[in-house]
UniProtKB/Swiss-Prot annotation:
Phosphorylation at Ser-348 controls the reversible conversion from a leak channel to a voltage-dependent channel. This is Potassium channel subfamily K member 2. GO terms for molecular function: identical protein binding; ligand-gated channel activity; mechanosensitive potassium channel activity; metal ion binding; outward rectifier potassium channel activity; potassium channel inhibitor activity; potassium ion leak channel activity; protein heterodimerization activity. K(+) 4 binds at residues 157, 266. It comes from Rattus norvegicus (Rat). The record marks 141 as: pH sensor. Residues 17-38, 51-61 are annotated as: Important for GNG4 binding and L-glutamate release in astrocytes. One of its GO terms (biological process) is detection of mechanical stimulus involved in sensory perception of touch. Pfam families: Ion_trans_2.
Length: 426
């Protein structure tokens, strides 16, 4: 069966192991699909499987990431609660005591009137009006410069929240304006990010050329150039603007850095907003701040894109290593299977040949003994005849040892006397 199976397989050659699927010479003679002709083997897969493996994240991975994010949120909530809740309780207690002291000192004002005044103040603050001083100290939040800055926060999706449309017409226009402006700003941000990436890329290339002259490894060069790129961007778009805001807005260094990071990451809490106080040249100051936001966002987008490229490269290398391992495992399995099949085929052929030889010897012995049954048989020949007749339905196992043939039922002494008979019949 094995021999027939080997003849049915096209291109099968007895005694030859499976062709090396990674060897170009042997692969050139084999028309069947192979792993690869390159030095780095890859695993064959259909286009659908490869696309799904590349573009679709597995549910197990999604679930793991989801659990990590939830755990991260729980940790953040715990830390923020521990840091901020005592301050909130202190502020609530302080305002209650101040209200009681104010009512005690001003008997003409009752608690209801005071609450109404406080509610109006809260409403004014929510509308972007700070009820301090007189009208001469008030700054409009809807002049041309402030409106330009607000429109910029809409399309950049920062949304500080210090001011917002209060009229129905303003809300409707803001919806339409955001839906059209956000994609437009996305194209602009991508273009500016590409230009910044090109500029920084040229600078990084010069730095790498300098380090190459010093015989530094490529990995160290890449790490050093990346660190220089990030540090230069942080100085240009974070540290320097923070110093400017600290000087112009009168904030502390921590508040200035806090505003810069919260703004450029498009979080935009709105607790700190540039241009919120009475500043000279305010109409020009806010548009300049918006252009800084544009370039800073482009820089952060370039950094995030670079990090994404790193992750893709790492993922690609990991997949290549796994694919190479699988290819070698498949090659090893194929070779072992081929060798096992070849060994089994050879054993089958040898056993079959020996069986045929034993059958032929048995037939010749039967014919010889049948022709000489009237002759006088020696005790050894009589033993051979009896054993042959009783074992006619069994296979006569040939035993080859020291180039001498011993038949079942013969002692070495008898075999020595009749060995010539067997040799003549072979």
């Amino acid at each position: 069966m094995l021999a027939s199976a080997s003849r049915e397989r096209p291109g099968y050659t007895a005694g030859v192991a499976a062709p090396d699927l990674l060897d170009p010479k042997s692969a050139a003679q084999n028309s069947k699909p192979r792993l690869s002709f390159s030095a780095k083997p890859t695993v064959l897969a259909s286009r659908v499987e490869s696309d799904s493996a590349i573009n679709v994240m597995k549910w197990k991975t999604v679930s793991t990431i989801f659990l990590v994010v939830v755990l991260y949120l729980i940790i953040g909530a715990t830390v923020f609660k521990a840091l901020e809740q005592p301050q909130e309780i202190s502020q609530r207690t302080t305002i209650v005591i101040q209200k009681q002291n104010f009512i005690a000192q001003h008997a003409c004002v009752n608690s209801t009137e005071l609450d109404e005044l406080i509610q109006q103040i809260v409403t004014a603050i929510n509308a972007g009006i700070i009820p301090l001083g007189n009208n001469s100290n008030q700054v409009s939040h809807w002049d041309l410069g402030s409106s330009f800055f607000f429109a910029g926060t809409v399309i950049t999706t920062i949304g500080f929240g210090n001011i917002s449309p209060r009229t129905e017409g303003g809300k409707i226009f803001c919806i339409i304006y955001a839906l059209l402006g956000i994609p437009l700003f996305g194209f602009l941000l991508a273009g500016v990010g590409d230009q910044l990436g090109t500029i920084f890329g040229k600078g990084i290339a010069k730095v790498e050329d300098t380090f190459i002259k010093w015989n530094v490894s490529q990995t160290k060069i890449r790490i050093i150039s990346t660190i220089i790129f990030i540090l230069f961007g942080c100085v240009l778009f974070v540290a320097l603007p923070a110093v400017i805001f600290k000087h112009i807005e009168g904030w502390s260094a921590l508040d200035a850095i806090y505003f810069v990071v919260i703004t450029l990451t498009t979080i935009g809490f709105g607790d700190y907003v540039a241009g919120g106080s009475d500043i000279e040249y305010l109409d020009f100051y806010k548009p300049v701040v918006w252009f800084w936001i544009l370039v800073g966002l482009a820089y952060f987008a370039a950094v995030l894109s670079m990090i994404g490229d790193w992750l893709r490269v790492i993922s690609k290398k990991t997949k290549e290593e796994v694919g190479e391992f699988r290819a070698h495992a498949a090659e090893w399995t194929a070779n072992v299977t081929a060798e096992f099949k070849e060994t089994r085929r050879r054993l089958s052929v040898e056993i079959y040949d020996k069986f045929q030889r034993a059958t032929s010897v048995k037939r010749k012995l039967s014919a010889e003994l049948a022709g000489n049954h009237n002759q006088e048989l020696t005790p050894c020949r009589r033993t051979l005849s009896v054993n042959h007749l009783t074992s006619e339905r069994e296979v006569l196992p040939p035993l080859l040892k020291a180039e001498s043939i011993y038949l079942n039922g013969l002692t070495p002494h008898c075999a020595a006397e009749d060995i010539a008979v067997i040799e003549n019949m072979k």
